[in-house]
Amino acid sequence: MIRNGKRRLALTALAGASALALTLTGCAGGGDTPSGDAPAGFDAEGAKGQDITFWVMGGDTPDEAREYLVDQYKQATGGTLKIQQQDWTDALTKLTNQLPDEKNTPDVTEIGNTWSPTFTTAGAFSDLSPIYEDLGGDKLLHSFVEVGEVDGKQYALPYYFGSRYVTYRKDIWQAAGLEVPTTLEEFNADVAKLKTPGQSGFYIGGQDWRNGVSWVFANGGELAKKDGDKWVSTLSDAKTITGLEQFQTLFEDASNAPATEDDSTPWVNINNDKDGAAPSAATIIAPGWAHWSIGDYVGDDDKGKEKREWNDEIFGVFPLPGTTAGEPAPVFAGGSNIAISAKSTKQAGAKELLRIIFSDDYQKLLAKNGLGPANTDFVGDLGDDQFAKALVDSALNSKLTPAAPGWAAVEGQKILEEFFGKIAEGGDVKALAKEYDAKIDAIING
């Protein structure tokens, strides 16, 4: 996150940002601001006085952004916006149970981009096609728009994008005589050299498929593909197997994390403890916004939460390298979509909130805080520092999970956590792939 003002990307990062915009979007489209007359398709009159609820997932939406939304919604409608934070761990269950319930549904909800196909095909969200152009149209992240579409109509739009990149301890790497690797093969070998009984060369949990899948993607593998009009799991594909075997070796040779640990908080492991004790990890991979939790301990805030200050002498970042020197590996494209519940009785107020969220000012606010904006016109507002460059460079080649109608069920049943965990425990990769292909095939098409 870049909290110290609006800065433009340096030439190298700007070139990456432009490429990212071209990769993820088409061109042209609309845009609006919270002030002024509501565009066609909105009902500003009907929104007056409506109190609405907005679910955000986890803590990624910063307090500054939440306060902005509450204030702007009050100004625009006179109504109250209640923002409720949901934990990612049980969000899927809550969405499944409450979206169909008119009395308990959120009016607007953030939703993981990988869950969007399931809920859109199930009819859980309102049709946003009439206001799509007003909210940004083709300037919005194309891959995120696609996962929220059904029959050419938009039901869930991008909220923000993130990407995962490597954070490393410069002091530990330099002491070992290691430089930033240029290929995935070099990375795997280097982090293995850094492992000790008390320190992971690369801290990654065995069940952490969202990061582990980068080794699959880097070797040309996929989790699933569409065959005709059906989706099929491709864990047994030769290229996928190559990536899974690399992950298995990496986990054994470089990580001390439990085989049962999933997508967690590895930044805790790369930091020194409060008392200065050595870190338990020399290298991690995490979403870009995690760097605000990495650094030297500088005390606690008024809520008792640790404050960390980045130290360039100790910490550094780089995109996970790919199999070809100089090219980043494809990583899992983090981020969220946003949608209006079809069961909400306050559609006008919900649309007004979306108008504020997709306004120029809010898109800039997201970028300032290190969250990739939904509207690619504002990618440059991410800044020009090392974090912005690593975010853009890693996002250039990032990939989403399959846009299959049953994908939310795959994630909800934690099939991939179980699969990757068994691989981390040393299981037969090919046999496990065949077993879990069958499990995924049974539910992936909804």
Model-derived features with residue positions:
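Conserved N-terminal structural module of periplasmic/extracytoplasmic solute-binding proteins
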Residues: 2-117, 309, 324, 365, ...
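Hinge/lid segment of periplasmic solute-binding proteins
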Residues: 41-46, 113-164, 215, 312-318
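Short, solvent-exposed loop/beta-turn-alpha elements that line the ligand-binding surface or hinge
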Residues: 43-47, 129-140, 222-242, 249, ...
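Conserved C-terminal helix/tail region of periplasmic/extracytoplasmic solute-binding proteins
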Residues: 80, 174, 396-446
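A structural signal for short loop-to-beta-strand junctions that line the ligand-binding cleft
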Residues: 97-98, 105-107, 136-171, 201, ...
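Extracytoplasmic/periplasmic solute-binding protein
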Residues: 155-159, 164, 188-240
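Extracytoplasmic ligand-binding clamshell segments of periplasmic binding protein
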Residues: 223-300, 348, 432
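C-terminal lobe and pocket-closing loops
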Residues: 290-311, 323-418
